[in-house]
Amino acid sequence: MHINVHTHLFTLRTVLTREAVRAMTQRLADAGVPELLVRALTRFLDQQLDRPELLDEREILARLLHELRQVSGFDRFVQDNLARLPFNVVIRGDGLDQLPLETLRSALDQLTTAMAPEDDVRGRPFDIVATLRLAMKGTITEVADHLLEQLEPEDAIVALMMDIRAEDESDRDRRTFRLQMDGTREAALQRPGRVLPFFAVHPGRPNHFELMKKGIDSGAFIGIKLYPSLGYEVDSPELRRVYAYCLEADVPILLHCSHGGFYRDKAFIDYCDPRNWDSVLKGELAELRVCFAHFGGWDSLGTAGGLDEGTWGGTILELMRERPACYTDLSFHTDQMHDPAAEERYFQTLSRLLEEEKLSRRILWGSDSWLLRMEMTEATFWRYFRERMSEEEFRKIAVRGPRDFLGFPEVEPGEEGRTEPAANLQRHLDFLAQNRSQVGSHPSRWVEELTEVAFEPGREPPDWHRRSAPARAIFALARGFMSGGQRNAGFAQARDLRLKELGYWDPRDPNFEGQTCLGLARELIGACEDHGTYAPGWDRNRAIERLHGVFRRGDKRLVQVAGLLDLIFDFERAMV
């Protein structure tokens, strides 16, 4: 079983705040995404924050192109690049939402190609729409499945929550964080043993300690995630209280430790400096399990002097050698891929470090997906490293090290190390065992072996269950238009029915658009009004207009309609 210790499974719905929009678009700009596209993405994300939706690829492309046309400077850009933009008619015309998918894809590709410097391989965001599609999935479990499907059946991922908040956090932003908590816990139950959650701690959140303690004590979460560049120092009294708890409860900590990523202010990037931990990892706290993610950056391994004394990489290396429980990971190390000399140095250095017995347990495998998707897929990242490392080396970073950091028992019989799970992992095993009849799938083999209980998967998918008001509403409406076979198949099978497969779908009927589809939209919205209130940005007229278009096109599945309704309304139980 390989373990990726660094992934993010949150959806836009469960992470997007005003501060998150600012941090995300700043990261895109820092990564070389063209300015016009960054500004269009900012407008797009602001709209999703004000009135969230579930959009498919065609809808995302149409919205992005529409926002590009509204950005100041775009018309001048078009005039200056007419010869390079054969899709000028598309980007100037109306009716973007009616254009075929391939036309929209080609238009965005041509635009981003023209925007990017010819020598900047990172300037053309080929994968930006794929990233948005992944981030706009309806539930955190769906994001987890997207990553897990690219791995071997027993492989596991550590799901790191994120808390990107501002001091003037709104009630909506607070609810967003709670949804991320709920959705991450749900993913652990849906995919027992394959999704291992870490709770995000931000000391600026008034009840951060109570929320963290509840998550850890319950067994749903096995570690905590810190992101100092979001605006807090690691040696604060608030975090020292967190560290004391982590030491007592035997909880590992993973923190962002590179010059890239998200930051509240550029001055806060230095809050991630590993030298800041010299004053923390003393006395009893010297025993803390701490992973300094990213090894300070890819250049620690890929450039001359990257591990010199005083560098972030050099400091992390010193901590791993001298402290009893310090680790690092290789997440989002991609820049060396574009420079053969840097790539050779990178893997030579990594191989040399892994020859040291202590370091062979301290350097961990991580990808930083889904954020990595801006450049490549999870499978591509894994394949790149496995092709350049020996099987023994990869086993050290993807099996031996992660097991040691997370608290697994010894890797091989007779090998020195734990003989029982660490307390953090044992709590998670107890949590899964207590919910053995309420998991979404059969657990990983290691869970069955360490719990010795019989699991009976009976948990419905988080995006389609009978307790969900929107799922019940669209199913009840659709049932009146189902064939006998569709009705007999039942609730679970109805999940993936497309609207156009139902009996109402007849575009040749002169009353189809103005009467049938509009009537269905009104009926469905009325049914939901009985169980929830309109979410910010939505009202009855907007909701009916949106559903009218959905029924008219007929290409969405029932589960997608339920997901849209879950965004339009605030129900007592959200689908995350």
Per-segment meaning from a language model:
Residues 18-27, 221-223, 233-365:
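Catalytic pocket-lining loop regions of alpha/beta-barrel enzymes
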Residues 6-12, 256, 294:
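Histidine-centered divalent metal-coordination motifs
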Residues 1-3, 12, 16-19, 23-146, ...:
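Mid-to-C-terminal alpha-helical segments outside catalytic/metal-binding sites
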Residues 473-516, 520, 529-552:
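Long, low-complexity or tandemly repetitive, helically biased scaffold regions used
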Residues 156, 160-272, 327:
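Active-site gating/metal-coordination segments in enzymes
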Residues 104-105, 122-146, 173-186, 239, ...:
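Well-ordered, non-membrane alpha-helical segments in soluble/globular domains
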Residues 14-18, 170-172, 209-212, 265-268, ...:
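Short aromatic-enriched loop/helix-cap "lid" or pocket-rim segments at secondary-structure transitions
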Residues 11-14, 165-169, 206-208, 232-234, ...:
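Short catalytic/ligand-binding loop motif for oxyanion handling, primarily in non-cytosolic enzymes
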